[in-house]
């Protein structure tokens, strides 16, 4: 059965600390989550300075954060003393972690997504962890005028090396104008499409830049590019209830989430010892980042 569009929601403009513009697609009042995905921010800005992209230390519980960059480089530090610049940053908060994300030098273009994946009930208090993956290790398919990168999960027999705690589908699609593609995706997975560039059509309905399209159930997905486009397909097996999404936390109860917020306010979360402020003056064009740490 072919998947069709159930609803289309346009991402809302917001700002990160430092005034970087982001387009927030999840969560929405009308759509709280898609599979395990409970949060999705899209950013696309030029001349991004260290002052503009500086998300200071903040806590997470019960989820995984996924930073996936189409272009540019983000610098991650956390309370496990990880410090890593890279294209795919996959952090497991589990029972609790503190982290920060920055740029250490001006980026000509910073374009990418940050998503959060809520952990299943029995994994929400696992030990925190962090993994970084270069984009080159992710499988890529060439299908009928489209290049598809398997960020997480499996597509047409191609399996991502990124380990997850539940079944996910997370695919980055770059497609040429006029190309049409048919995919077979796990029928039990909830799915949505978010358009990061250009526009596409599904069954004659257009999905434009900054649109999040929730899809109906099915095992086949067909789409056509009305112009050169880039979008992600995301989702997976549904998160079981009760699932509470509160500030930066995914928990079983509201009480647990509120306690996590109190713990943060009371300084109970571990610090990010390697976090520091970067400024444009810190770096010349050829500066070595390691000299700043």
Model-derived features: positions:
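Jelly-roll (double-stranded beta-helix
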Residues: 1-293
